[in-house]
């Protein structure tokens, strides 16, 4: 998967179109990412199950995963770009911006 934890992304489709955020977590098996402040849902949590900030249960607002096809990585200039790969001088695979050719 070309999007990793810590990347800044732009949402390109869906209700949150145009929103920018940082990837909190990536799920390669399902090809989904968790983006900070995007796709917020309200989850009802039981009193006995403390989870993600809910100390005593109730209704918790949290981010839900979004498919990677609905986001684009932002390059160093802050522009949305597709991700490519190249090998550096040590033979290590690095991600590059397709827009300007710089490393991500």
Swiss-Prot record:
Keyword RNA-binding: yes
Protein name: Large ribosomal subunit protein uL24
Known partners and oligomeric status: Part of the 50S ribosomal subunit.
GO BP, sorted A to Z: translation
Keyword RNA-binding attributed: yes
SUPFAM superfamilies listed in its UniProt record: Translation proteins SH3-like domain
GO cellular component terms listed in the entry, alphabetical order: ribonucleoprotein complex; ribosome
Family annotation (Pfam families): KOW, ribosomal_L24
Gene3D superfamilies: 2.30.30.30
Family: Belongs to the universal ribosomal protein uL24 family.
GO molecular function: rRNA binding; structural constituent of ribosome
Alphabetized UniProt keyword annotations: Ribonucleoprotein, Ribosomal protein, RNA-binding, rRNA-binding
Role according to the record: One of two assembly initiator proteins, it binds directly to the 5'-end of the 23S rRNA, where it nucleates assembly of the 50S subunit.
């Amino acid at each position: 998967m070309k999007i990793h934890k810590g990347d800044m992304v732009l949402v390109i489709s869906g209700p949150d179109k145009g929103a920018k955020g940082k990837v909190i977590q990536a799920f390669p098996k399902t090809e989904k990412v968790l983006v900070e402040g995007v796709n917020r849902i309200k989850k009802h949590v039981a009193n006995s199950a403390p989870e993600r900030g809910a100390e005593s249960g109730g209704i918790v607002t949290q981010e839900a995963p979004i498919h990677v096809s609905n986001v684009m990585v932002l390059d160093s200039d802050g522009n949305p770009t597709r991700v490519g790969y190249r090998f550096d001088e040590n033979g290590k695979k690095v991600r590059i911006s397709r827009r300007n050719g710089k490393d991500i």
